[in-house]
Amino acid sequence: MSSKLLFPEDFILMGFTKYPWLDLPLFFALLISYMFTLLGNMALILVSQLDSQLQSPLYFFLTDLSCLDLCFATTTNITYIGCMAQAYIFHWLGCTECVLLGVMALDRCVAVCRPLRYSVIMDHKHCRRLSGTAWLVGLANSLLQSTLTVQLPLCGNQELDHFFCELPGLIKMACVDTTINEATLAVVATFLIMGPLSMILLSYGCIAQAAFHTCSSHLLVVSLFYGPGIYIYMQPSGDSPQDLTKALTLFYCVITPMANPFIYTLRNKDVKGALRRLLRSAILSKRI
């Protein structure tokens, strides 16, 4: 039985079609959140690149995270040519963020526990290597999981009970035994979620007493991202209500990217100072 390629014209994205009264509120909520996502992440990227005082590894990784969140939110708000293209990109970005959050925790651990050697250990070359590893691991996992999903036959099934093309929803559309796909997804997701999460908890466990104020923002972002991911991916398929799964997915792919730059900015004096200097320079340049 041959597989059927999925393109937007081939099937219907259901979303919350059982609750039509949610259409208009959801439209405006998603539009506003997407605009804040663009504004917040672009501002953080801009000040990190233009301000000479924000050239440390911390802001290198924050810039990387903001770029990732911009792509993440855009992937789930703008329709791509085909459903599979969206699935590949969405899964790639999600896996990359899992690994990148772990790398950022390692950076904080080195900064607090080894401050005298921090600039040597976390030099620019090493930061780029860690960032590249996160992106490559996410890409490799996306190629594996999405390719396995593409090959599943649909047997005429055209209704995808989701907002966009995410792998668990696509697997449920198949008309054959998907045990291998579900097991592979669960095993790899466990590794990619619990591996970085364990590294984060271990890193912050070592420095919690000495510098909790430097970690609280990152821990908040971690809880917002990993909490829904653990619930959605690390349980047997079909055990959770689909509406709850959709709501949690919407939370971590829309709300989290919007919240990340504000969480980091509002609790970071350096970033707030850089924003003020950037605005002051812009105002003075217009006067001149």
Regions found by a protein language model. Give the residues of each.
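Transmembrane helical core of 7TM receptor-like proteins
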Residues: 1-288
